[in-house]
């Protein structure tokens, strides 16, 4: 967290960064992030992929870590680098050749250090992010559809995802567009 605070000060200046740092520092001892687990059988038909010609999907690459550092947080870039090294499957969404979002999946919950009951054929959909400038354009829906298709092609039977309870946009994508159960 210190690295993230230093980054905020360098990026935004002390005055702009201080309210964020103060809020995080005050809530840090009491932080209890709650997640919900979302499940979806891959035996169900996949959602209709609406043509989003402006969004392309490709594998996440080491060069994409600069985007994560710039748009999100340095600690998230470090986590993404660890995921690449551990063999997670990462994908990136691009508009006009520029990365605007990413998402991860893996077949071993211990790689993500979460306590989920995995069965043979399960795949875990983990972290996903969309740049603020691209939100509301269908980036996460496109990434989620791409992950579902890849999981189905790899003959997985079920996907699991854990999502923060306060992440309404992500929960809406999974409930409404991906037909997942919470």
Predicted regions and their residues:
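Short, surface-exposed acidic/glycine-rich loop or hinge patches that mediate macromolecular interfaces
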Residues: 62, 133, 164-165
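Residue-level signal for beta-strand positions within conserved beta-sheet cores that form or flank
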Residues: 53, 121, 157
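Conserved acetyl-CoA-binding loop-helix of GNAT-fold acetyltransferases
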Residues: 127-130, 136-153, 172, 176
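Conserved active-site alpha-helix within GNAT-family acetyltransferase domains
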Residues: 165-182
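Conserved GNAT acetyl-CoA-binding A-motif
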Residues: 151-163
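Acyl-donor-binding surface of acyltransferase catalytic domains
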Residues: 1-63, 67-71, 76-79
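A conserved beta-strand-loop-helix scaffold within acyl/acetyltransferase catalytic domains
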Residues: 72-132, 145
